Every structure is written in C-alpha cells, then in structure tokens.
Regions:
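Glycine-centered, phosphate/nucleic-acid-interacting loop/turn motifs that mediate DNA/RNA or nucleotide
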Residues: 25
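Conserved hydrophobic/aromatic packing and binding residues within compact polymer-binding modules
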Residues: 18-21, 51
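Short glycine/proline-centered loop/turn elements that form peptide/ligand docking sites
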Residues: 4-7, 14-17, 34
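Arg/Lys-rich, alpha-helical DNA-contact motif
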Residues: 3-9, 28, 42-121
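Residue-level "edge-of-site" marker
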Residues: 21, 34, 67
Length: 121
C-alpha cells in the first residue's frame, strides 16, 4: 500500500493533482488508515499512471470520468472503452502529423538560411 506522497512519486502526479482527481471522481483512495490518511493499492497506482498517459494525449477530465464510469461497469462496456481509446488514438495521430508539418517548416527555413537566402518568409 502507498501513501499519497508515495503515489505521487510513483506516478509523477502532484499530491494536489491526486486530490483534484479524487474530487472529480476519476481516482479513489483504497482506504484510510487510523490517522485518516489516504492509502492506495497497486491497482490504483496503475490506474493513476494510465490517467497520466490519457492526459498526455490531451484527453479531458470529463472524458476520463466517462471512461472511468464505463470501466466501473465491468466487461460489458469493453466495446465502448475501445471506441473511446481509438478516438483518442486518432487524435494523437493528428497531433503527430501536425508536429511533423511543423518540423518540415523548420527544416525548410533552416535549408533556406544555409543556402544563403536572406528572405524573412
């Protein structure tokens, strides 16, 4: 079992972010100890780490909350969860394409400067 501080270190989430996610219903403490401190198990750690990945892809808190609600309903919602993840994956591919276009624009400008062009455009 992990304290909130340990969970923070293991996932890279700030303690305040963990509490925020709890307030939004997308993360829950496994329980509380005698001093009323939150504690978390390994499943919660894995889920918190997955939340990090989802957020890094740009998924909103509300979409993660919807995904979590489906997750909590069990195996019958696997098709809907797959659809959500595929939609998010498509968004990531769009982000990659946009970044590749940005790299091409930078490369083009670098090549122009290296060839002696002084144009600003």
């Amino acid at each position: 079992l992990f304290t909130i501080g340990e969970l923070s270190k293991l996932t890279g989430l700030a303690v305040g972010t963990i509490r925020f996610y709890e307030s939004k219903g997308i993360l829950s403490a496994t329980g509380r100890d005698n001093n009323n401190n939150r504690y978390y198990d390994d499943d919660t750690r894995a889920w918190a780490k997955f939340i990090v990945y989802l957020r890094e892809t740009g998924m909103s808190i509300n979409d993660i909350k919807d995904y979590k609600a489906l997750l909590d309903q069990g195996e019958k919602t696997i098709p809907q969860r797959i659809e959500i993840l595929n939609t998010q994956k498509a968004k990531v591919y769009q982000q990659i394409e946009a970044k590749q276009e940005q790299i091409r624009a930078l490369d083009h400008k670098i090549e122009r400067y290296q060839s002696g062009s002084t144009k600003h455009v």
